[in-house]
Amino acid sequence: MASFLDTIDRALVIAPHPDDEVLGCGGTIARLTALGREVHVAVMTRGTAPRFDPASADAVRAEALEAHALLGVAETHWHDFPAAELDRVAHADLNKAMQDIVGRIAPDTLFLPFVGDIHLDHQLVFNSAMVAARPRSPVYPVRIYAYETMSETNWNAPGITACFQPNVFVDISRFAAAKAAAFGCFTSQVQSFPSERSQEALAALARFRGATVYREAAEAFMLLREVG
């Protein structure tokens, strides 16, 4: 059966922090790279002192590289905006960084964190990415999806803030194990169940999203825009 994934040649996944890309898109990344597609990941922030231990920031980046290697990511692009403090960064600076990475990679498909996530970094990254992806530029992604991030998307306020209502589902039945292995690389981030950042919670969400469309496991997205 044909899939919309067949139309993707080069994808860019924007992650506010290391591991967001695996939580939201790990199975889809693995499926795309198995098809021979080119997938890039841009991580927009870095933990800085005094809020974060610099050694911990280095460790989580090393974990991310290990996870990305497992998933077949073509290249990881690091930015050093302060984690949990993006609201202190000039919006124009974040816009410029996003425009630069989108222009340099020239993806046909963009995966973004959801604007309704409770973490302000996610909201700001979403907004800047949408600025960078405007179709008035010479190079722009023709399709944009928002992904869900356990521990962020699920803490919105329904009816008050934007609610994640997926309309695209990617069958990751054959890639759920790869996603779990990639998440397992983040030893500094994985927590025990019933935390949302546990292997059990991640698997439960994949099974629920899969059952929604009669699949064993799936990742859910919102299609934000497609230009044909």
Predicted features along the sequence, with ranges:
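Generic hydrophobic, amphipathic alpha-helix propensity
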Residues: T45, V60-A64
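A structural preference for short, hydrophobic beta-strand core positions in alpha/beta folds
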Residues: V41, H77-D80
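Active-site phosphate/pyrophosphate- and oxyanion-stabilizing loops and adjacent acidic/basic residues
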Residues: A30, L65, P166
